[in-house]
Regions:
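Cytosolic-side transmembrane-helix boundaries in multi-pass membrane proteins
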Residues: 292-327
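Short, Lys/Arg-rich, polar N-terminal cytosolic tail immediately upstream
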Residues: 1-12, 317-333
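A structural signal for multi-pass alpha-helical bundles of membrane permease subunits
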Residues: 11-299, 303-305, 340-627
Length: 627
């Protein structure tokens, strides 16, 4: 009797294919995330020393945690400052982003230009660039904190409120610079709103202010939560963050209690738990009243009441000439008249200038001669154009060597990340399998894990695998879906593939194409916008990464890292000139720093303006917001 041939059911086949496509992520998660997280916690319970023979562990329980809270409280105090600043910046950045997304969603001229300006800092600003601009007060508008209004607020509400206002104004450009992604995401979401809802609410007598609170805000509320979390994670992982700098410094010290890998791991876990608590609080805050929110996506059953407002008879309403002038100045709705549009253009132009001011400062200061630098009568504009600063900065950075290093460290991991995240996103979007929702939740959860939690175990693992010190420490995690910000890219592909009809895949299968062939020949070519946005942002984020690059690849020479070593490199090239000597031509100064900063961001500037259409429009078309 012949045995019955075993055949998979459709459901089983879907599960097998789904797990096959996400298998890279499963392997990568356990190797590059789950194991490092568990091992990091284990290290935090030990005194760790790293002799030449390996690693020595001595179990000490929670002594490292106790030491962090009771004795060496440097990181804890810095963490408190970070939380205050992060909460303030999260709120201001997202309020600003919502306002300007709504402005860009209006029918205004030069929309593409303003959008390009607002997105510029996202692409080119790395930790060292931000640090150089901070050191030279280039991201503080001149006189911004001298307004009398600050004194008035201080006298009315107290010194603490006045200090808060000063802090906000001092960090205004920084906050604006961190808002580019959020503006684009809100803008994409607003463009998806049904205009009929606004028209219906307008007929009902709703003012623009009421439309915002009752129509727009409920619709974008889920995206506000996502952007708040993204902002928090972005601030927590920024290489200039003092908390992660302190954690890294302790890691490289001796293996006593209060120093070394064990203590650094304990600090990392404290940091992680604080971020996780903030994320949970955000979820709880945004879940309040969620059941009472009604998302209006169409006009069906929308109640209209045109007797809500009655217009009183006044001179303005009765006189035709006055009514005509008023209509031109104020518009029919108050938001389409000359006065409002003039205000909008002045506001958006002022903010665009604020975005560009550091680059203007950078360019003009870099052209100043040493004489201009020390002459108090010379303002921002140099008296003569002095290109020698660029000659010295070019030599100090070692431009071509650093450029080659930046490309090597950015290109291969970016390509690996595109490949892996596309496969994973396709598997999640196209196939139903058991534990799929759990996989998605875990993928999203990994986004909030700060780099310090993973860096110590991965450092030791890469050392044992022989990939420490080369670009493999970036390529292998990226190849298994665990690269820089891989969660975002997986979700981009997941959302984009969901917009492509499954009938195309089914037609290709009927023609005899296998699942891999369908993915490569049918679905992936349709996902070009998503591929472009993932590659460009992967490339840029690997390019700008200095914290992990400096840790994993000792001696790496990239443009951002060379900028962070600028002063030491300058002394090697030109000697340590006495700053009090009369011959100060070769002395390092602000102009040379600015020239070095501009040189370090020049390749990204050229790439951004050459490909800005892809940078900005691909975000629009890639389904980054989800639904």
């Amino acid at each position: 009797m012949m045995k019955k041939k075993f055949r998979l059911t459709f459901k089983q086949r879907e599960s097998v294919l789904g797990y096959m496509f996400i298998s890279l992520w499963i392997i990568g998660f356990f190797v590059f995330t789950f194991y490092p997280v568990i091992y990091s916690f284990f290290l935090s319970l030990n005194r760790v020393t790293i002799p030449t023979t390996g690693i020595d562990l001595e179990f000490i329980g929670f002594a490292n945690f106790q030491h962090a809270f009771a004795i060496d409280r440097v990181m804890i105090l810095e963490l408190g400052t970070f939380i205050q600043d992060a909460v303030l910046m999260m709120v201001i950045i997202n309020v600003f982003a919502v306002i300007f997304a709504m402005i860009l969603n209006m029918d205004i001229k030069f929309k593409g230009f303003f959008r390009t300006i607002f997105f510029l800092p996202v692409v080119i600003v790395s930790g060292p660039v931000m640090q150089e601009l901070l050191n030279n007060n280039a991201i503080i508008l001149p006189g911004i904190t001298n307004f009398q209004v600050i004194s008035v607020f201080s006298s009315i509400f107290g010194e603490s409120f006045g200090e808060l206002i000063v802090k906000v104004f001092n960090n205004l450009i920084s906050m604006f610079w961190f808002s580019g992604v959020q503006i684009i995401v809100y803008l994409v979401m607003l463009q998806k709103m049904n205009k009929e809802v606004y028209e219906a609410s307008e007929i009902d007598g709703a003012s623009p202010w009421e439309q915002f609170w009752k129509v727009t805000l409920p619709f974008i509320k889920p995206i506000i939560l996502i952007n708040m979390i993204y902002t928090l994670v972005m601030l927590a992982g920024f290489s200039n963050n003092r908390v992660i700098i302190i954690i890294k410094d302790y890691m490289l010290k001796t293996g006593e209690v209060g120093a070394g890998f064990g203590f650094s791991a304990a600090l990392s876990w404290i940091y992680f738990l604080v971020i996780a608590i903030i994320v949970v609080l955000l979820f709880l805050l945004f879940s309040l009243g969620r059941r009472n929110i009604k998302y209006i996506r169409n006009t069906e059953h929308f109640h209209l009441d045109m007797t809500r407002y009655t217009e009183k008879d006044t001179f303005i309403n009765k006189n035709p000439t006055v009514k005509k002038i008023r209509k031109k100045l104020m518009g029919r709705k108050g938001t389409d008249g000359w006065v409002f549009r003039l205000f909008v253009y002045l506001l958006i132009a002022s903010v665009a200038f604020t975005f560009l001011y550091p680059f203007i400062y950078l360019a003009l200061t870099s052209l100043q001669s040493p004489e201009d630098i020390i002459d108090a009568t010379v303002g921002l504009v140099p008296r003569t154009i002095y290109f020698e600063n660029y000659v010295k900065a070019f030599k100090t950075i070692g431009f071509f060597t650093a450029l080659e290093g930046s490309i090597r460290i950015s290109l291969l991991p970016a390509l690996a990340q595109v490949f892996s995240t596309a496969l994973i996103g396709y598997g999640l979007a196209r196939f139903d399998f058991k534990l799929k929702k759990l996989v998605v939740v875990i993928i999203l959860f990994t986004f909030i894990i700060p780099a310090p939690v993973l860096m110590i175990p991965t450092y030791l693992m890469y050392r044992d695998l022989g990939i420490l010190g080369n670009v493999g420490s970036f390529i292998y995690p990226a190849l298994f879906g665990q690269g820089l910000k891989s969660t975002i890219f997986i979700m981009i592909f997941y959302q984009f593939f969901n917009t492509i009809p499954k009938v195309l895949d089914e037609a290709a299968r009927v023609d005899g194409a296998g699942p891999i062939r369908v993915f490569l020949r049918v679905t992936l070519p349709l996902a070009v916008p998503a591929v472009v946005v993932v590659f460009l942002f992967s490339f840029v984020w690997y390019w700008n990464e200095t914290y992990l690059t400096g840790l994993y690849i000792d001696g790496a020479r990239t443009l951002p890292l060379q900028l962070s070593r600028f002063a030491a490199s300058f002394r090697e090239q030109f000697g340590n000139v006495d700053p009090n000597a009369e011959d100060f031509v070769d002395r390092i100064n602000e102009a040379i720093y600015m020239a070095g900063t501009l040189i370090s961001i020049l390749p990204l500037l050229l790439m951004y303006f050459g490909l800005q259409k892809w940078f900005v429009e691909s975000v629009d078309r890639s389904g980054i917001t989800g639904e």
